[in-house]
C-alpha cells in the first residue's frame, strides 16, 4: 500500500478557475487527475491536507468532491483556510463519497498507520493580533485532541500528521512540540504557494520529518510518502 499526499487543489466549484493566478494553473486538476490515475491503486491512500474547493457552501462543493471521490484510493481530508464549504463535521462526512474520510479532532487507522491532524494557523510572532493568537491556541488544542485519539487507537502504531498551515518555520517552533510529544513520524502540510514554497521547512526537524505538498510546488503531481520513489521536482512558481 502506497501513501501519497497533495494539498491546495483549489477546485473551481463551477466558477473559479485557478489560471487567474498564472498560466501554470491552466488545466491543473486535469494534470493532477492524469498523474493520480497513472500511479494510485485502489488499495493506496491519498492525503489531502486542505483547500480542496472554492465552494462557499457544502452543496456547492458536491461536484468537486465527487470528482475526487471518483479517483482510485482511499482519501483522507483535512480542512484548509479556504474550505468555507466545510460546515459541521457530521454534515461533511455524510456528503462525502464512499472511500473519503474527513478528520476533525479525531484520528483514523489505515493499513497499520494512524492519521491525525488539524488545520493549524499562522504562527504568532511578537506583533501577532490577539485574534490570531486565540485561533492559534485553539488549533493547538485541536491537534492535541486528534493525536490523543490516535494514541487511544494504538499506543505504538506510527502516526502521520496532516496540517494545512505550516506547522513550524526556521524561526518559530509552532506546533512541533505537540507532534513530537505523540511520536509523529511524518507531517504533511500545504497552504504555501509561489516563492514562499522555497522557504518551507522540509526534512527532519527534531524527531519529525516534514513534507511540503502544495500542488503547484509539485508540478501538479502527487507526492509519495511511502511505497514508491519520492518526487523531488519543485517549481516554486507564483
Regions found by a protein language model. Give the residues of each.
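Binuclear metal-dependent phosphoesterase catalytic core
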Residues: 17-18, 23, 27, 34, ...
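His/acidic metal-ligating clusters that form di-metal
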Residues: 31-45, 69, 130-199
